Amino acid sequence: MTEANRILLGVNVDHVATLRQARGTRYPDPVKAALDAEEAGADGITVHLREDRRHIQERDVLMMKDALQTRMNFEMGVTEAMLAFAEQLRPEHVCLVPETRQELTTEGGLDVAGQEARIREAVERLRGCGAEVSLFIDADPRQIEAAARVGAPAIELHTGRYADAHSVAERACELARIRDGVEVGLSHGLIVNAGHGLHYHNAEAIAAIRGVNELNIGHAIVAHALFVGFKQAVKEMKHLILSAAARG
């Protein structure tokens, strides 16, 4: 948990691997990107090992586990194969996410309320191997309360609908929903993180919400890095969210 008026930045390097996999090459290396992100001020590195292995591969995860100086936030679907892999990997942080093969990116939050027994079992197994578990969920009080019931110490609120809002009014509505979700999470003693679809023009409002511990941001940083370099892109995002949190 961060101190008041401070916020952490988790840098997701999945889309460095997306660029590599597009041509089946050995470059660019997401492990190098992760190390550069740490050097530039990232507080942690997020990677999502998807069932279809469309970007990050097992080798990337294993190398990062050994090389990172901060911490790995390992995103995974709730499947037996991924649970078994995580039990061997023993990452410091695990975030359980919903996953379907057809989606371009994670399209919604995990339905914890609709499958409490299954999620509770996964949380218990992961905590048993030393991981702090978070659940990637919508800013819905019903889902947040379910997350607390299954024993997850942390949640990551899905900011996708806020990021994709088509009008000022819609965005304000989604921002209010996230703000309320943060309050509900804190009232249940949860660590509250946020992410999905955040970029250099919309992350500040989320960073300014009191009680948000960390933002996980990837695609926007990778895209901006094409023009300014990876380290600079991370530095700019870190400065942006820290400034917003201080003002908030």
Curated annotation (Swiss-Prot):
Keywords: Cytoplasm, Pyridoxine biosynthesis, Transferase. Homooctamer; tetramer of dimers. 1-deoxy-D-xylulose 5-phosphate binds at D14, H15, R50, H55, T105. The lineage of its organism: Bacteria, Pseudomonadati, Pseudomonadota, Gammaproteobacteria, Pseudomonadales. It comes from the Bacteria. The record marks E156 as: Transition state stabilizer. Pathway: Cofactor biosynthesis; pyridoxine 5'-phosphate biosynthesis; pyridoxine 5'-phosphate from D-erythrose 4-phosphate: step 5/5. Belongs to the PNP synthase family. Pfam families: PdxJ. The active site is at H48 (proton acceptor), E75 (proton acceptor), H196 (proton donor). One of its GO terms (biological process) is pyridoxine biosynthetic process. It is found in: Cytoplasm. One of its GO terms (molecular function) is pyridoxine 5'-phosphate synthase activity. 3-amino-2-oxopropyl phosphate binds at N12, R23, G197, G218, H219. SUPFAM superfamilies: Pyridoxine 5'-phosphate synthase (SSF63892). GO terms for cellular component: cytosol. It comes from Stutzerimonas stutzeri (strain A1501). PANTHER family: PYRIDOXINE 5'-PHOSPHATE SYNTHASE (PTHR30456:SF0). It catalyses: 3-amino-2-oxopropyl phosphate + 1-deoxy-D-xylulose 5-phosphate = pyridoxine 5'-phosphate + phosphate + 2 H2O + H(+). This is Pyridoxine 5'-phosphate synthase. Its EC number is 2.6.99.2. Catalyzes the complicated ring closure reaction between the two acyclic compounds 1-deoxy-D-xylulose-5-phosphate (DXP) and 3-amino-2-oxopropyl phosphate (1-amino-acetone-3-phosphate or AAP) to form pyridoxine 5'-phosphate (PNP) and inorganic phosphate. Its main location: cytoplasm.
